[in-house]
Regions:
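Acidic, low-complexity intrinsically disordered segments
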Residues: 38-76
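A short, structured beta-strand/loop element
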Residues: 21-48
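Short, surface-exposed, charge-dense and proline/glycine-enriched linear segments
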Residues: 9-13, 33-34, 70-76
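Negatively charged, low-complexity tracts enriched in Asp/Glu with abundant Ser/Thr
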Residues: 1-22
Length: 76
C-alpha cells in the first residue's frame, strides 16, 4: 500500500493516509474548508468503486467522491 500523500482538488489540499479495515484497505482523508475547519473521512472500495464514509460531511466533499477516488487510483 502507498505511503502518505496529498492532492490539490478544487483549490483545497486533501491529505491521504493508508489504513487497513480488517482484511480490506482504504484511506483516511482530511481537508480544511475555507473557514479552517478540518473535515475527516474514510475512503474504501466496494465493487471496484471508491466510497466515502464520514459523519456530517458538507455537500461539497460528498460531491467530490468520484474525483477523490480517481486521485487515489492515480496515486496507486
Amino acid at each position: 500500500m502507498s505511503n502518505l500523500f496529498n492532492k490539490i482538488i478544487n483549490d483545497r489540499q486533501f491529505n491521504f493516509q493508508p489504513l487497513e479495515f480488517g482484511h480490506e484497505t482504504g484511506y483516511h482523508v482530511d481537508v480544511k474548508d475555507k473557514e479552517g475547519t478540518r473535515w475527516e473521512f474514510r475512503m474504501f472500495q466496494i465493487d471496484d468503486k471508491w466510497k466515502m464514509e464520514g459523519e456530517k460531511l458538507p455537500s461539497w466533499i460528498h460531491d467530490l467522491e468520484s474525483v477523490i477516488g480517481k486521485a487515489i487510483d492515480a496515486h496507486e
